Amino acid sequence: SSGEELKCDTICVAIGLVPSIELVDAMGGKRSLDSERGGYVPSTDDTISMVGDCAGLIASGFDHIAYRMDWMRALAKVSEPGTIVCQCEEVTRADLIGVQPPNYLERPSPMKARSLETLLADGPPNQDQIKRLTRAGMGVCQGRRCRDQIAMLLAIEAGTAFGSVPHASHRAPVRPLPLKILADWEESGAMRDGWVVWFGIPTQWVPYRDIGTPREAEHQ
C-alpha cells in the first residue's frame, strides 16, 4: 500500500484456508456455504460430531470468500495465461477458460471450437463438466488444491457469485467405489505402462527403466 517496490524473481502465494469437508461430504452429510467460516462447511444434525478443519473455521465476521475472490481477480490481471491452475494435471488458466485438455493430451479440432464462452451460452458453469473437458481437478489431490480456485475463475468469467457454481464432486478414494468396478477393469498395454509415472503425465516423472537411456529426454 506504500508503493514500495521490491526486486524479486519468484513470488509464492498462499491465500486463506478452506475447510476440509471431503470425507463428511462423501458420506452424504449436508453442507452449506458460510463465507465467515471459510467456505463450504458441514451442516449436519447433532448426532454427528466433527472436530478440526472439517468443521469449518471459527466465525470471526471476516468474509473469506470475498477476500479470496478479490485476490483471484487481482492475480488474473497480473499473471500470464499460461499460469498453472491445476498442478496435478498441468492445466493452465488459458486451458481452463478455453476449455481445452492439458498439453499432454491431443487437442482435436472439435475441442478447439469450444470455449467457456460457448458453454456459458448453454447454461451456468459447472465444475464437473469442466473437469471432464479439461481434467482440471482430476489429479491425485482429487481437486483439494484447485477446486475452489477453479470455481472462483469460473464465477469471475461467468460474472456470477462463487456460490452459484456447483461444488465439484469428489474422486476415489474419497468417493467409495465397489470392488467389482476395479476387478472388471480392462487396461490397455499403454495404460499399464503409464502407471509407473505420475498418472501417465510424462513431464512430471521419469520411469525408472528410462533413466540413463535416450528415452529419458522425452520426459523433460
Name the predicted role of every residue range.
Residues 1-134, 138-140, 144-186, 190, ...:
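Residues forming the flavin
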Residues 149-150, 182-220:
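Short flanking/linker segments adjacent to small metal-binding domains or redox-active Cys/His motifs
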